[in-house]
Regions:
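Gly/Gly-Pro-rich "capping" loops immediately C-terminal to redox-active cysteine motifs
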Residues: 661-694
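Electrostatic cytochrome c docking/interface patches
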Residues: 628-651, 667, 731
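Detector for the c-type heme attachment site
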Residues: 87, 397, 659-666, 690-691, ...
């Protein structure tokens, strides 16, 4: 079921000098005496006033219809608008606007906030063209907002089934939309690509992008549009899928081309020469094709119009453990790689693999940037990339040749890269003993956007570490559901055991200013937690970033000095945008804690709905009220059989842990920690787990997946863990 609420569907009447506006969400103005409700259906429109209204249907149609490849390229010269997810096709997130700068940023104030009406993660960067904003919330819901007023124009809900949230590894998030020739494009969480009329919010067309519905494919990334082609990838490697990128006709939705990242069953014909080449780097004894092999290109893309190349970053292996999917080893192309494709045909041109034979969920899907740098005295067209594996790469984007790589955080899986661009691996990283992975699968840098300022020559990189210990799961089989295997009850296929031994490394969150030519850190800012927001840098010598503990911050781009901050209540994970409207520069950021780390942890004691915060110099609007996060004391008093704690632990790991965390240990993020729920709820867990009473919030229905005796064992684990960690009364 889908829902569109459109500003364009209203009547504007003048009666006894009183204007009445009826919007899809109800009557916003007071209906004056003498105005009869039946008149609202008359269809009379205040045409002269509407012609002057920059939020009118005519104006929105005019400005959004002008957005095409030429518009996006031309806008890169001024940065007046923010027409594509990374601002420009190079994904620099560098704005040439400087009305807000180091001299006046302290005068930045709130202009307005907009309630996204979401309680899960918000990862989208807003698009803005001449004061019309398009942004997504959780569940792939699209909002159109009038920047001049902060008011809603329309919303579009693609109707993603709310009980299907478990089909994604990392929350029901969406990183934004694409805008092209009067249409807004969104990749829905359930795998549909939807084109929406930019004026009305009505669906124009939709296409199912999923090739195999027996596995859990999802979409969380933003589409890109290049020369009339809408490009979209997918996620789901944890669930055993085969990654691919597809191009659709922006006008009709017809599929134009598709490129698979990894090969299929070698007993069948390969789609093209690139797949035949890739198959030679996989061991068929692992029967990798049963669960796809992975490689899903779920986020980053960039486009070089001069070379006519699309660049994508590819994902991790399925399963994680290479010993299982490819027992004889091999690079397993094109996992964890940057791949260049012909933008017209989708044909493979070149690749550079950043993590050969990925074994640690070291995706290369993290945002990349195209830049022109002088290296060793010569101009080079390069890709700048900081993937999960902890190394910062500089790659020649004309041919995929390796230029340099340097670790931007501590790493223990490799000592560095040789002259040929191959990692010098540490043998223990693939050993049989439990291994404290640094970085871990959360990545030294995840999807949070980085930015590049050509004036300072620096990249502003959200770095982090979330400790995890990895070891081989020798009991794993394809699509097995064995208690104790991480989330196997919901379809995960890792072949890797997590935290069988407690990790000893320490977590951190950090903003790093990195010199890509010298391959060194210039300055840094440390945070209280991992999982901080993406960055934006400007010609005003500023860097903007949101933090996990609920602050939106501006730094001096050259020195790293903190110049300004504003509280946002809940944590920020998304990247901000800046743009000019009627001669005024604005900065907007979509706030809403969540994502894979944010599901089970938090860094602030406040919470609230997803909200767009918009700032300008001199703004003085009041922020929304921040609600204190309600976390009761550790649950106590629920009776259980101590013998059930062990089996309950295994069942919890297989069905609950990646959403709810460890009872009483994690704080609970976008989803509650079960160690802190009321005893009455824990004692009646079957009323929560069966028949889907909370599916509207993303909770799956475990009917048929678990039995009542299983829930009693899970209850025993939760209560037993709470009892074990509860502080003991001080001895008298």
């Amino acid at each position: 079921m889908e829902r569109a609420v459109a500003r364009g569907e209203f009547a504007c009447l003048v009666f006894n000098s009183v204007s009445i506006k009826l919007k899809g969400r109800g009557i916003r103005s007071v209906i004056a005496a003498g105005v009869v409700a039946s008149a609202l259906s008359a269809g009379a429109v205040c045409a002269p006033a509407m012609a002057q209204d920059k939020a009118s249907a005519d104006h929105i149609k005019a400005v959004t219809s002008a957005v095409d490849t030429g518009f996006i390229r031309a806008n890169a010269a001024t940065s007046k608008d923010w027409p594509t997810i990374g601002l420009d096709y190079a994904e620099t997130r560098y704005s040439k606007l400087d009305q807000i700068n180091t001299d006046n940023v302290k005068q930045l104030g709130l202009k307005w906030t907009y309630d996204l009406e979401s309680v899960r993660g918000v990862e989208a960067t807003p698009l803005v063209v001449d004061g019309i904003m398009y942004v997504t919330a959780s569940w792939s819901v699209v909002h159109a907002i009038d920047v001049r007023t902060g008011k809603r124009l329309w919303t579009y809900d693609p109707g993603v089934p709310r009980d299907g949230g478990y089909k994604g590894c990392c929350d029901v998030v969406n990183r934004g939309v694409a805008l092209y020739k009067g249409k807004v494009f969104v990749g829905a969480f359930d795998g549909r690509l939807v084109a929406i009329d930019a004026v009305t919010g009505k669906k124009v067309w939709e296409e199912d992008t999923i090739v195999d519905h027996s596995h859990s494919y999802t979409i969380t990334g933003a589409p890109r549009v290049v020369n009339g082609k809408v490009l979209i990838g997918n996620g789901g490697a944890e669930f055993g899928v085969r990654g691919y990128l597809t191009a659709y006709d922006a006008d009709t939705g017809n599929q134009l081309w598709r490129w698979f990242v990894v090969p299929g069953d070698p007993s069948k014909s390969f789609e093209d020469e690139s797949m035949e080449k890739a198959a030679k780097t996989w061991d068929p004894a692992g029967k990798y094709w049963i669960n796809g092999g992975g490689g899903t290109p779920w986020d980053t893309m960039a486009y070089d119009p001069d070379l006519n190349l699309i660049y994508i970053g590819t994902g991790n292996g399925a399963p994680w453990n290479r010993n299982k999917r490819s027992p004889a080893g091999g690079d397993n192309l094109y996992l964890a790689s940057i791949v260049a494709l012909n933008a017209d045909t989708g044909k493979y041109v070149w690749h550079y693999q950043e993590t050969p034979g990925d074994n640690w969920d070291y995706t290369s899907t993290q945002p990349m940037i195209l830049a022109d740098l002088t290296i060793d005295g010569a101009p080079r067209k390069v890709i700048l990339h900081a993937p999960k594996n902890g190394f910062f790469f500089v790659i020649d984007r004309t041919n995929g040749k390796f230029i340099s790589a340097k670790n931007y955080v501590d790493v223990n899986w490799a000592k560095g890269y040789d002259a040929n661009g191959r990692p010098i691996e540490v043998p223990e990283a693939r050993g049989e003993k439990p291994y404290d992975a640094i970085p871990g699968p959360y990545g030294a840098h995840n999807w949070h956007p980085m930015s590049f300022n050509p004036k300072t020559g620096l990249v502003y990189l959200p770095a982090q570490h979330v400790p995890l210990n990895l070891s081989e799961d020798k009991s794993w089989r394809n699509n097995s559901n064995i208690p104790g295997q991480a989330m196997s009850g919901l379809g995960w296929n890792l072949a890797t055991a997590i935290n069988v031994v407690d990790p000893t490394s320490q977590p951190f969150g950090r903003l790093i200013a990195w010199d890509p030519v010298k391959q060194q850190q210039v300055w840094k800012q440390d945070y209280v937690s991992p999982w901080n927001g993406g960055t934006l840098t400007t010609a005003g010598n500023l860097v903007f970033q949101g933090s996990a503990d609920g602050r939106f911050i501006a730094y001096n781009a050259t020195t790293g000095e903190k110049l300004w901050e504003s509280p946002t209540g809940t944590g920020i994970v998304a990247g901000p945008a800046t743009y000019m409207v009627d001669g005024v520069q604005y900065v907007s950021v979509a706030v809403g804690w969540g994502g894979v780390f944010g599901l089970l942890e938090r860094a602030t004691d406040k919470e609230g709905p997803g909200t767009v915060f918009t700032f300008a110099v001199g703004g003085n609007a009041s922020p929304p009220e921040f609600t204190k996060y309600q976390m009761q004391g550790l649950v106590e008093g629920v009776k259980y059989n101590p013998a059930d704690v062990g089996p309950g632990t295994l069942l919890y790991v297989s069905n609950c842990v990646f959403c709810h965390g460890v009872p009483g240990v994690n704080k609970g993020g976008a989803i509650k920690n079960l160690g802190y729920i009321p005893a009455s709820e824990l004692a009646n867990l079957k009323d929560i787990a069966f028949n889907g009473p909370f599916k509207a919030h993303g909770m799956p229905d475990f009917t048929g997946k678990l039995k009542e005796e299983d829930l009693l064992k899970i209850t025993a684990f939760i209560q037993g863990t709470a009892d074990a960690i509860r502080p003991k009364p001080a001895a008298k």
